[in-house]
Amino acid sequence: MRPYVSPVYNVMAIPVEKIKANDYNPNRVAPPEMKLLELSIWEDGYTQPIVCYYDHENDEYIVVDGFHRYSVMKTSKRIYTRERGMLPVVVIDKDLGERMASTIRHNRARGSHS
């Protein structure tokens, strides 16, 4: 039996075109916070990988956590250009129910900020 290795030790650069949003993300971010996230990524770069599930059948990555960071890459031309369209991704191999629970846990762990 292989020892457990956390996904963060296996970050990969994946073309954003191979990444798809999930259809269950419950988290919403207001436009001012999205602008701040874009600025943060512009100033500091991507400091956390996007958590994805790899769908072998369709050869694509489905976002589990990091939807808004993914969205910034899709909507900010300057970031897309600088990053050459590549996103840092870690993969978790879980079924849909477990992925949904992971998404909720990640969102709740960050909490809300005022």
Where are these predicted regions, by residue range?
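Noncatalytic linker/hinge segments flanking ATPase motor cores
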Residues: 3-5, 34, 54-55
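Short active-site oxyanion
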Residues: 58-62
